[in-house]
């Protein structure tokens, strides 16, 4: 401000009859500027404190959250075949064979049921709130090794069904059986351990690429992680990274493309070697070339596994054993691709572009 007065050749300033020299005005303006700056900084600090308190409330709310209720008593164990009786029994080491350890409370007998990935949903009703039901009489049957696809508009209930399979929510009515066992009897951690999940929104953690793949199975060796990456089609781009599998990932893998992040997620599921897979829109947000790479890896991963697929691109579900069409929580059509095309109904309209999934 004083520079402006000097440039204009104004040696003094008159305010309300008082004459002030530049020597007085300039320091006053500078001090006012500094004072206002400090006030601005204080307001910013207050905003930071308020945001911190709000975050602290959420943190303490999470800390105080009660543990998830779990009444399950059927557990997943390593199994082996007894050479004398040819019956399954529990093993104290990794055998590559899994079984459900099912104690029968009435008799005290322990039954070992092979983990196969056989799933039955029988007339299931569900609502996120008691007064708003989102699934109505849903029945789904998946034999071991089958690929079952769910299609429908956003909000039809596709993801809700997969959440019920994982028991993130409990059903209001009906039955869900996994390998013939009511899922309510299976311990939740063991149930989820038997399921491989690949989501559209990938979460990568700060650490190496190898560590992020190993999250699927913390006991996996480096060789097993690399084999899983090759199966997923991720090995090619990983080996081109600056440090290969030892490349550090930060910021949820910000240095990788969406397709590359998804390939790592698929490798993470592959290293767990689950008998059942849930693919929730796994290839709906990547380019066509990357989708082809991902799909090739997924086809290998799905061999011999029960797979539930939710995709917005019908090309990814065309080879499914069963396609289930949902509308407002109800199954309106089911069958394979050729059967549904022949019906010329809802799926036919989707496939020919008459309807949109979004």
Predicted regions and their residues:
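ABC-type nucleotide-binding domain
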Residues: 79-358
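Solvent-exposed, non-transmembrane helices and loops of integral membrane proteins
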Residues: 68-80
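Proline-centered turn/helix-capping motifs that create local helix->coil transitions or kinks
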Residues: 64-71, 236-240
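Conserved E/DxxT/N motif and adjacent residues on the DHp alpha2 helix
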Residues: 61, 68, 214
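Helix-loop-helix
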Residues: 1-57, 62-63, 88-97, 101
């Amino acid at each position: 401000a004083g520079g402006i007065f000097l440039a204009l050749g104004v040696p003094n300033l008159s305010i309300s009859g008082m004459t002030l020299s530049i020597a007085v005005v300039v320091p006053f303006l500078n001090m006012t500027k500094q004072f206002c700056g400090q006030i601005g900084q204080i307001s910013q600090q207050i905003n930071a404190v308020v945001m911190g308190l709000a975050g602290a409330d959420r943190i303490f709310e999470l800390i105080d959250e009660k543990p998830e209720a779990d009444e399950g008593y059927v557990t997943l164990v390593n199994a082996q075949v007894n050479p004398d009786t040819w019956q399954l029994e529990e093993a104290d080491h990794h055998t590559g064979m899994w079984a459900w350890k099912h104690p029968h409370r009435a008799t005290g007998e322990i039954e070992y049921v092979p983990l196969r990935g056989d799933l039955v949903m029988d007339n299931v009703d569900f609502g996120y709130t008691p007064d708003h039901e989102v699934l109505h009489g849903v029945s789904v049957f998946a034999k071991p090794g089958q690929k079952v696809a769910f299609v429908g508009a956003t909000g039809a209930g596709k993801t809700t069904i997969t959440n019920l399979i994982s028991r993130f929510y409990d059903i209001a009515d009906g039955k869900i059986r996994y390998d013939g066992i009511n899922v309510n009897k299976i311990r939740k951690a063991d149930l989820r351990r038997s399921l491989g999940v690949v989501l559209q929104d990938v979460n990568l953690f700060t650490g190496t690429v190898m560590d992020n793949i190993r999250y699927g199975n913390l006991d996996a060796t480096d060789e097993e992680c690399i084999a899983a990456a090759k199966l997923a089609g991720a090995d090619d781009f990983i080996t081109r990274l600056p440090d290969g599998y030892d490349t550090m990932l930060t910021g949820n893998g910000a240095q990788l493309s969406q397709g590359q992040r998804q390939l790592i997620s698929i490798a993470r599921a592959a290293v767990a070697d689950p008998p059942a897979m849930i693919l929730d829109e796994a290839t709906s947000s990547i380019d066509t070339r990357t989708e082809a790479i991902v799909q090739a890896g997924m086809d290998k991963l799905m061999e011999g596994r029960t797979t539930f697929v939710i995709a917005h691109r019908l090309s990814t579900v065309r080879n499914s054993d069963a396609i289930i069409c949902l509308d407002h929580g109800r199954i309106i059509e089911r069958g394979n691709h050729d059967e549904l095309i022949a019906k010329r109904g809802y799926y036919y309209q989707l496939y020919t572009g008459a309807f949109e999934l979004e």
